[in-house]
A protein has these predicted regions:
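Short beta-strand-centered segments that line the small-molecule binding cleft or hinge
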Residues: 2-3, 68, 109-113, 131-170, ...
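Short helix-boundary/capping micro-motifs
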Residues: 12-28
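N-terminal winged-helix
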Residues: 31, 82, 88-118, 122-126, ...
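A short LG(V/I)-centered, amphipathic sequence patch enriched
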Residues: 42-61
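Flexible hinge/capping segments at coil-to-helix
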Residues: 88-89, 155-192
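Hydrophobic hinge/microswitch elements
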Residues: 129-134, 138-141, 147-148, 206-256
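Secondary-structure junction motif
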Residues: 177, 191-212, 243, 279-283, ...
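A late-sequence structural motif
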Residues: 256-300
Length: 303
């Protein structure tokens, strides 16, 4: 059997999408061109690799075997390409990252500055919740991940690169907005909008309450910092948020940071990967870049 890498790429895309049309769109080809190559691939196999059921396509047993082999071959080909580029000393090729959602307020800025220096890097940055980032970390789906609350695991390498300051926020008209030296006991009497369980900010707040033997029943549980900010601006309650996420709202005077004992809580953002993982030249270069340049790029060294 003689397969080309292009045929295997087409086959992988059709299998993953269960659609000739979506695969063609993804690869910027016409559907007939994809169909012709898949037909040639089937001829090489001597067995059908797709079957149509109720106008939907599925891989056959032969197709599933070919799919597994295709992934391995394509991954090895990509690794070879990257190795050759690294031997040339060229910072070029894919960069795969997973980052927690709150980091969307600074990671795109860091990546954008990096890409200005290394325009041949091909980035893929997945924004998701902490639990999913951790899953991707252990499944080795990315070069490295970015999060605030790292798992306690000695199999991980963690590199702090940026301060993460957590603060209590309120609507400017809230009764506590102008009060000084608010006690934690006063604070916990208020309604709180919180992230889902397992998120970094939720973990920090829960630990603070536990340490001080307080309990807060969340008024609302929301899936993003943006949703929480909108809720606070609507007067639905208070929240604990990263200072990184508040620049626009503070400038517009739509949210205020409360003066509460025990705050701000100063944490760190971390670049994390499995211990012993060898980063590609692209990943290592970006890794070193954010560790060295984050504060300067984001203006946190300015007085």
């Amino acid at each position: 059997m003689h397969f080309t890498l292009q045929q295997l790429k087409l086959f992988e895309a059709v299998s993953r999408n269960n659609s000739y049309t979506r695969a063609a769109e993804e690869l910027h080809l016409t559907q007939p061109a994809v169909s012709i190559q898949i037909k040639r691939l089937e001829e090489q196999c001597g067995l059908p690799i797709f079957e149509s059921v109720s106008k939907k396509i599925f891989t056959t047993a032969a197709g599933k075997a070919l799919y597994d082999a295709s992934l391995d071959i394509l991954n090895r080909a990509e690794e070879l390409k990257n190795t050759i580029e690294e031997l040339k000393g060229v910072v070029k090729g894919p960069l795969r990252l997973s980052v927690v959602t709150t980091s969307k307020y600074f990671m795109p800025h860091l990546l954008g500055t990096f890409l200005n220096q290394y325009p041949e890097v091909e980035p893929k940055m997945v924004f998701t919740n902490r639990a999913r980032v951790i899953q991707r970390l252990y499944d080795n789906e990315d070069d490295f991940v970015v999060m605030g609350q790292t798992p306690e695991d000695d199999k991980l390498e963690t590199y702090p690169f940026l301060e993460n300051i957590l603060v209590p926020v309120a609507h400017p008209d809230h009764p506590l907005a102008k009060k000084k030296k608010i006690t934690l006991k006063e604070l916990v009497k208020e309604r709180f909008l919180v992230r889902e369980e397992g998120s970094g900010t939720r973990l920090v707040f829960d630990r603070l309450l536990e340490k001080n033997e307080f309990k807060v029943e969340p008024y609302m549980e929301l899936g993003s910092s943006e949703a929480i900010k909108q809720g606070v601006m609507a007067g639905l309650g208070l929240a604990i948020l990263s200072l990184h996420s508040l620049r626009l709202e503070q400038d517009a005077k739509k949210l205020v940071v409360l003066d509460v004992e025990g705050f701000p809580i100063k944490r760190r953002w971390f670049a994390v990967h499995m211990k012993g993982k060898k980063l590609s030249l692209v990943a290592q270069t970006f890794h070193d870049f954010i560790l060295a340049e984050s504060n300067n790029i984001l203006g946190f060294n300015k007085k």
